[in-house]
């Protein structure tokens, strides 16, 4: 969740995002960065800089390396540089400079992937990074890109050259032709891979439909309806076994869908009437909850079964529990920016 150029809540939060397995989340601040354990909520790291904002933070699971990009009113680093921070040494150990602003960074144990506004560059994760690949994209100001963290699957997915298309490449064998998925008619707003790299979920700027595709064939597996009104989708995430997805939007809601068992999702009683528009056969979320503040948020599934975490731009943390019927209750509320260190 990128809150640049300015967070309306005035709390210094510039960026919030989960690590690869959603076990932690990192925050870029006007004066440094912080790392939290997601569930249960604990502040694990707080790095303050006397002068300097961090507009983007990418973790690599729970290891000591993080990718940082400067941002905010007084950026700590130039916005056209990727800095790899070693949290054991408390300093940057790798620096990669570009001719244009860095939009996003993705990490694997063996790769650094840097997203620019119309191309993606892939480097070795070594002390002197070596450029391996360059992929052209359509104009991509949000820096959309997902990298499979699974050691047996090196998939990289990003917006293709055509509007609404997703391109999937295998970094382990780039001679193979990429999988091109015409996911939406409009501009993409969000993409997400499951942990295994077998499924990709997509949304367009219209934000009414979420589509799930098989990454190897590009075939559509499910089409899910978030709502009938347009919405800005902030986040899509799968749970660990990819049986569920959660979706957050600017309507202040988090929706939960069954990704593998479509019968769990709600459907109109008129769904089987062939003369009615496709809308009536839509599969809707089986559970949803309202973020009380209505603040922009990112969401992921918690460590407990049937739990979802929402991390909000106003500094609030919510944990919700839901049951198979879709009934939802708020379990935990906290202000994560006001917490103190817990290194245990």
Curated annotation (Swiss-Prot):
Q: Which Pfam families match?
A: PROPPIN
Which parts of the chain are coiled coil? none
Which SUPFAM superfamilies does this UniProt record tie to the protein? WD40 repeat-like
| This protein's UniProt keywords | Autophagy, Lipid-binding, Lysosome, Repeat, WD repeat
Has keyword Transit peptide? no
The UniProt entry's GO biological process terms, in alphabetical order, are: autophagosome assembly; cellular response to starvation
- Motif L/FRRG motif covers 224-227
Which residue intervals correspond to the WD repeats? 183-223, 228-267
A molecular function GO annotation: phosphatidylinositol-3-phosphate binding
Q: Which InterPro entries match?
A: PROPPIN (IPR048720), WD40/YVTN_repeat-like_dom_sf (IPR015943), WD40_repeat_dom_sf (IPR036322), WD40_rpt (IPR001680)
- CC per GO annotation: lysosome; phagophore assembly site
Quote the function comment for this protein. Component of the autophagy machinery that controls the major intracellular degradation process by which cytoplasmic materials are packaged into autophagosomes and delivered to lysosomes for degradation. Binds phosphatidylinositol 3-phosphate (PtdIns3P), and other phosphoinositides including PtdIns(3,5)P2, forming on membranes of the endoplasmic reticulum upon activation of the upstream ULK1 and PI3 kinases and is recruited at phagophore assembly sites where it regulates the elongation of nascent phagophores downstream of WIPI2.
PANTHER family for the chain: WD-REPEAT PROTEIN INTERACTING WITH PHOSPHOINOSIDES WIPI -RELATED
Tell me the domain comment.
The L/FRRG motif is required for recruitment to PtdIns3P.
What is the protein name given in its UniProt record?
Answer: WD repeat domain phosphoinositide-interacting protein 3
Q: Which organism is it from?
A: Xenopus tropicalis (Western clawed frog)
């Amino acid at each position: 969740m990128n809150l640049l150029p300015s967070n309306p809540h005035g709390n210094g939060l510039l960026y919030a995002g989960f690590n690869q397995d959603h076990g932690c989340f990192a925050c870029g601040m006007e004066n440094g960065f912080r790392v939290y354990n997601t569930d249960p909520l604990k502040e694990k790291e707080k790095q303050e800089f006397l002068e300097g904002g961090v507009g983007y933070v990418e973790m690599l699971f729970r290891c000591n390396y993080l990718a940082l990009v400067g941002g905010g009113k007084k950026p700590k680093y130039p916005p056209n540089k990727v800095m790899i921070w070693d949290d054991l040494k408390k300093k940057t150990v790798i620096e990669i400079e570009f001719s244009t602003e860095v939009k996003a960074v993705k990490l694997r144990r063996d790769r650094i992937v840097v997203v620019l506004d119309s191309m993606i560059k892939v480097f070795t994760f070594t002390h002197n990074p070596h450029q391996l690949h360059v992929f052209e994209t359509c104009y991509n100001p949000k820096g959309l890109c997902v990298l499979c963290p699974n050691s047996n699957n090196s998939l990289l997915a990003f917006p293709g050259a055509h509007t609404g298309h997703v391109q999937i490449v295998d970094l382990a064998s780039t001679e193979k032709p990429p999988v091109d998925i015409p996911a939406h008619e409009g501009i993409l707003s969000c993409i997400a891979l499951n942990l295994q790299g077998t499924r990709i979920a997509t949304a367009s700027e219209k934000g009414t439909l979420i589509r799930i595709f098989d990454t190897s064939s590009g075939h559509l597996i499910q089409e899910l309806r978030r709502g009938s009104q347009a919405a800005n989708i902030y986040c899509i995430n799968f749970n660990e076994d990819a049986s569920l997805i959660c979706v957050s939007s600017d309507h202040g809601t988090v929706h939960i869908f069954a990704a593998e068992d479509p019968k769990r999702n709600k459907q109109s009683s008129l769904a089987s009437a062939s003369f009615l528009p496709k809308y009536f056969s839509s599969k809707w979320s089986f559970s949803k909850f309202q973020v009380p503040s209505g603040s922009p948020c990112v969401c992921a599934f918690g460590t407990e079964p049937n739990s979802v975490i929402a991390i909000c731009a106003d500094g609030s943390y919510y944990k919700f529990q839901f049951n198979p019927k879709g009934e939802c209750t708020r379990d935990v509320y906290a202000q994560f920016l006001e917490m103190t260190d817990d290194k245990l």
